[in-house]
Amino acid sequence: MPDIFIGTDLVEVSRIRSAIDNTGQRFLDRIYTKSEQEYCQSKANPAIHYSGRFAAKEAVMKAIKSSGFQDPIPFCAIEVQSKDSGEPVVILALNQDGYCTVSISHTESHAIASAIFIPG
C-alpha cells in the first residue's frame, strides 16, 4: 500500500477579503493563477471562493511537505480548478510526482480544505 499524506487548513474569509482589499491585484497574482482568479471573480461573493482556494492550496502544501518534499512550493504552483460538477481538481506544477485530491467547504465566515497526497 502506498504512503498517504494528509493536510488540512481553515481560513477566515475576512482575512482573505482584507488581503484583497489592502493589496489588490498584487496579492491575487502572488497566490492565484489567472484561471483561479477568473473562477472566483465569476461568483457572487468572490472572497468566499478565494478563501476556499487559499485553504486548498495550504492543505495541499501541508500534505506534500509531510511526505518529505523540501523544496519551496509557490502558491501558483498549485492550481485548483473545478469540474462542471463543482468538484475541485488539483493541478501541480512541481518537481514532485504524485496524485493529489482536495475537498473544499465554506460558510460566509470560514473556508476549510482537506488534501490527500500520494507520491508517485
Positions of the model-derived regions?
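Core catalytic alpha/beta fold that binds nucleotide/phospho-ligands
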Residues: 1-120
